[in-house]
């Protein structure tokens, strides 16, 4: 049979991007060039591997597969089922748990939806949860709200009450958390962070959850790669549910996973009857059909590949170096006189206070971007505004992937110190009537040529390190 459509159509569906859409291809090339010639210090970012890219760009994205392996709402899913089952198997193996005690959903599309899907599975509207306060290092999806506004949609569906860090130490105040949890009696206690640099005491969190009758949910989105490698403690011994993204320290594609307990949850004190966990069906139902339709099968395949890599000695070597590089950040910043929230780090990142320097995170972030350093402004304990917060968050995973070591991270801190000093000088030069953030940015743009030599130095230096594409 002859091809029923035109030759132009055939060329459109079979031609490569360079032939069919050079405009988009050029933007992609520009972004690759930016990544190659920049220092990426955003703690939630990483550079994934070539084989993960190979799996992402496949015809698996053509297939609709609503439902779960063996129970789909569409035909033709024989191989999709194989991929999803393999991904689930590798997820359990990567985190050193067994299928008799744990199950995992690999269809959830991203971290914040994964958390919402867990809440909806286990709570009725307006039931209660507790999570770490956002300016103290928590995450929006743990129910953040201010006095005047519910910021996260989670806080409109459910009631949320934050716990805090000790303002003197920057460490979670577990004693106050316990007292408040016993009074508030949340249905879910969330142990997870986005800008908290110390290890969470999962054993203590488990004890608190038991005292108030809550499920303990651990959001390990930032640290899951470190957990898989076994270089920091695992939450699986203590948690009922564990959620994670897959593209941060785990170094996979953009996605998420929800792990849930199987087996016996408790034993009735009076009757001795065993009470099983009932998490698997509610969570799976919440993901599909509750919140999503068809899963992204190409992403699940790429995640399976990343999880295979996460179970290797080379991945443990990488995560060990991530911790060393984070310590290098800590040591060099402190040597240069900076204050770090919680006085340092146990993980992959540091949170640097800029209050003592007379500038804020938004201004330093802007200057850093002008010299090809990507980091992010971040709230620190005591902040009132997330738009002009008092700190910057700096992570080690991305540049460690590219092969940088401790001395390289010392050098990076010295670059940031130059950016901070430039921001200080620029801010102090502005008149009182025109010293807002927009005025600062305009002034930096006006004198950006002063930063050109430093930008060129960083541009050339970063090109020496490989970038998988």
UniProtKB/Swiss-Prot annotation:
Task: Indicate yes or no for the key word rRNA processing.
Answer: no
N6-(pyridoxal phosphate)lysine modifications at: 248
Pfam families named in the record: SHMT
**What EC class is this?**
transferase
Catalytic activity reads: (6R)-5,10-methylene-5,6,7,8-tetrahydrofolate + glycine + H2O = (6S)-5,6,7,8-tetrahydrofolate + L-serine
The pathway to which it is assigned is: One-carbon metabolism; tetrahydrofolate interconversion
Identify a single GO molecular function assigned to this protein.
pyridoxal phosphate binding
The yes or no answer to whether the keyword Zinc-finger is present is: no
* UniProt cofactor(s): pyridoxal 5'-phosphate
> Family assignment?
Belongs to the SHMT family.
What's the protein here called? Answer: Serine hydroxymethyltransferase, cytosolic
The species this protein belongs to is: Candida glabrata (strain ATCC 2001 / BCRC 20586 / JCM 3761 / NBRC 0622 / NRRL Y-65 / CBS 138)
Gene that encodes it: SHM2
């Amino acid at each position: 049979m002859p091809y029923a459509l035109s030759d132009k159509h055939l060329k459109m569906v079979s031609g490569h991007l360079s032939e069919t859409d050079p405009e988009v291809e050029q933007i992609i090339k520009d972004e690759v060039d930016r990544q190659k010639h920049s220092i990426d210090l955003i703690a939630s970012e990483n550079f994934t591997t070539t084989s993960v890219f190979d799996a992402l760009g496949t015809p698996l994205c053509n297939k609709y597969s609503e439902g779960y392996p063996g129970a789909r709402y569409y035909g033709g899913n024989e191989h999709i089922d194989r991929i999803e089952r393999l991904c689930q198997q590798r997820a359990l193996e990567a985190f050193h748990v067994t299928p008799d005690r744990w199950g995992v959903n690999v269809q959830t599309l991203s971290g914040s939806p994964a958390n919402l899907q867990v809440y909806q599975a286990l709570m009725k509207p307006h039931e209660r949860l507790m999570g770490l306060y956002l300016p103290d290092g928590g995450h929006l999806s743990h129910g953040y709200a201010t006095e005047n506004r519910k910021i996260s949609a989670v806080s409109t569906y459910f009631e949320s009450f934050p716990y805090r860090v000790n303002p003197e130490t920057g460490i979670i105040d577990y004693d106050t958390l316990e007292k408040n949890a016993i009074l508030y009696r949340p249905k879910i206690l969330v142990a997870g962070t986005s800008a908290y640099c110390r290890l969470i005491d999962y054993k203590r969190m488990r004890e608190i959850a038991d005292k108030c009758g809550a499920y303990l949910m651990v959001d390990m989105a930032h640290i899951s790669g470190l957990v898989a490698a076994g270089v920091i403690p695992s939450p699986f011994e203590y948690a009922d549910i564990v959620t994670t993204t897959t593209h941060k320290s785990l170094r996979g594609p953009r996605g998420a996973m929800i792990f849930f307990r199987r087996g016996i949850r408790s034993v009735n004190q009076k009757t001795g009857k065993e009470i099983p966990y009932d998490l698997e069906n509610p969570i799976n139902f919440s993901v599909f059909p509750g919140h999503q339709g068809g899963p992204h099968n190409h992403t699940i395949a790429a995640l399976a590949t990343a999880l295979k890599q996460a179970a290797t000695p080379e991945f443990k070597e990488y995560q060990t170096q991530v911790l060393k590089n984070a310590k290098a950040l800590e040591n060099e910043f402190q040597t240069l006189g900076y204050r770090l929230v919680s006085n340092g780090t146990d993980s992959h990142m540091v949170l640097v206070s800029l209050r003592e320097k007379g500038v804020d995170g938004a201004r330093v972030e802007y200057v850093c971007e002008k010299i090809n350093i990507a980091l992010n402004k971040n709230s620190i304990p005591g902040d009132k505004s997330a738009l002009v917060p008092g700190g910057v968050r700096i992570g080690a995973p991305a540049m460690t992937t590219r092969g940088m070591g401790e001395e390289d991270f010392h050098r990076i801190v010295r670059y940031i110190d130059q950016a901070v000093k430039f921001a200080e000088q620029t801010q102090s030069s502005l008149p009182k009537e025109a010293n807002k953030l927009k005025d600062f940015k305009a002034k930096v743009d006006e004198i950006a040529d002063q930063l050109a030599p430093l930008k060129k130095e960083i541009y050339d230096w970063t090109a020496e390190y490989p970038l998988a594409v």
